[in-house]
Amino acid sequence: MNPYVPVVNQKISFCKMLLNEGIKKNRFSKKKAAVQIQAALFQSAIYHLESAYIFYLKEIGHTYRCKDIESINSLKKLQSALININKIATEHDELELLLKDEQSWLSLLLAEYKKL
């Protein structure tokens, strides 16, 4: 079994919980403290989603039996790892398309993460 699958799922689950909590805070109060808590929850969700993305890259690397999976922390590093073992991953190509589109959910997520 791929050890990265449960980590990716856990990060996404944490993100859902944080977003639900942030939505609740927004519904019940407009006080400054509640707004700050909501912002903190949403920023935490961005951290978890970015982390899920990195672990997903590692998951792909593990699936294709790349070497030094722990060093994969970007799409370029995944691509290098795949080239080193003469493999092509359609998942990589799909992610690359998303990153080329500045308005894709992945590009927007990573742009927000860089702002934090």
What are the residue ranges of the model-derived segments?
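Acidic, Ser/Thr/Gly/Pro-rich intrinsically disordered interaction regions
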Residues: I72-L116
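A structural signal for well-ordered alpha-helices, especially hydrophobic packing surfaces
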Residues: I12, K16-L19, I23, L49, ...
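Short, glycine/alanine-rich amphipathic alpha-helical segment
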Residues: V35-I46, S80
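Short acidic alpha-helical/loop segments enriched in Asp/Glu that coordinate divalent cations
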Residues: K25-K30, L57-K77
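Charged alpha-helical initiation segments
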Residues: M1-A40
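Short, flexible coil/linker segments at or flanking structured domains
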Residues: P6, V35, H48, I83-N86, ...
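Short, hydrophobic, well-ordered secondary-structure elements
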Residues: L41-G61
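Short charge-dense sequence patches
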Residues: M1-V7, E59, T63, E102, ...
